[in-house]
Amino acid sequence: MSQRNRMLGEARLAPSAPRAYVTCAMSHPLETVIRNAGAFVLVGDSSEGRFPATSYSNYSRTGTRFYCLDLGGLSRSRGGTKGGKVYTKVEDLPEDRSDLAIIWVKPRSAARAVEVAQEAGCERVWFSFGAGHRDAVAKARELGMEVVEIGRCPVHYLDQQIPVCRVHTIGLKLSGAYRKPPQTDPHAKRREII
């Protein structure tokens, strides 16, 4: 086996396989996290902006199972999937939720969102976009939660995506950014994917 194939995790690829094919053929640890998460809890705050319009729409349109928990008190989604159920209290969340929380809030609210996720029984947390503030990451670790990722959008690691996200994901794969390992250090240079 060639040196190149050994470096690709013993992948059995034709020597002339284009780089884009090689990039897409390899799986990423974050793919496993999001694709096997079950019904994760998406924590956001509608008083801070567009949440849950964009996120709710993206996850709903791809058939992903999730429960949306809004710290801002909004009980129905807005945007492309208006009217979908949004929870405002942890005690109202269905029992079949998984142990993964995706945090999509501004940094000033992130530590509170982590506490709410922990109250919901979540043991793992994924900070989407700019939500991975150092204080929130420290709070998650203090509560014994596993920090899965700081900065990247989980939609990029789903099997199915809405067209705009699919195009963005292809660009990330071609650029090499998709393959970077999960970021769990809040002090590292940020690799946010917007």
What are these regions (language model features)?
Residues 79-95, 102-111:
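Glycine-rich, highly charged phosphate/nucleotide-binding loops
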Residues 96, 134-157:
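Short acidic, glycine/proline-enriched helix-loop-strand junctions
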Residues 57-79:
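NAD(P)-binding Rossmann-fold cofactor-contacting core
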Residues 21-23:
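Short, positively charged and aromatic/hydrophobic N-terminal segments
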Residues 120-139:
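ADP-ribose/adenylate-binding Rossmann-like module
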Residues 157-194:
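A charged, well-structured terminal subsegment
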Residues 38-52:
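Glycine-rich adenosine-cofactor-binding loop
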